[in-house]
Amino acid sequence: MEVMKPENNIFPILSVQTTYQCNMACANCYLGDMLNNPKFPDVDVKKFEDVIKRLPNKTHIRFIGAEPTLNNDLFKLIEITRKYKHRPNMLTNGLKLAQEDYVKGLKKSGMTWIGLSMNGGLDDEVYKRFDNGKYAKLKMRALENCIKNNLVPHINVIIDPSNIHILQPLISHIISLCKKYKRKIGPHFPIMLRVKSIGKMGNFLDSHTFTIYEMISIMRNLVGDIVPNFTIDGVKETNTCTFDFKTSMGKMYGKITDWSVDDDGLPLTNSKRRGIITDNYQIEPFFDYYGKIDETQHPR
């Protein structure tokens, strides 16, 4: 797929590499040696706005990183996204969201939902393996702050055979927080649990990469006979599906993504849903773009 100008964008989701700086050193990170590399600057606010105002259709603008909360212009970027009638969301490790005032700021600036990484669930020993640190308390506090302040969390968990056991306690904890703050899960507060396999690009654990059907089976064992939907945003997928399941606080949503790499060492290539605003402020398919950068091929 060719590089395209912003006005020709076809992707319903566009990621923005808000910053290449990070305050963690996760075992799984597709950025490889791009991480904390001064060669790669933060997004330029003016150039970002120039791209955003030229997009032809309403688009999900996904602020990613390394860690997007380390960019001091994040709230301004969110406000620009809203100004042009697009939908801002964010993928974060959640450490700064342990501060309730920061979550309130995200909500006030117009953030629609956040993807919160919780690879260890409630278990510090699992975080030590996946994220090289004990982060359970901070991430649980971040999750609670989101639910308390009506900022919808999508909880992201990379799974391999060593951490499947954290999923059920994590689901139970999410439900208990919704009970505590009287949040009915469903269309008006669409909490989603997103499970993903290990993508062997950049930095990654040398472990089994689950297929999508293995992960569907895992989720069925946890929450019942789910019905996977492989059509997302009107696009037929093979490596991604959504589902839902009943809880005592309403219908919770789920998503499963198989990050198996192809013969070129890339996951989810030629995606018709996921694009990225590149470092030269054009549009490309997400992983196809990163696959061309040497630093993603040389993990630390």
Predicted stretch roles:
Residues 45-64, 71-194:
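Radical SAM/AdoMet-radical enzyme domain recognition
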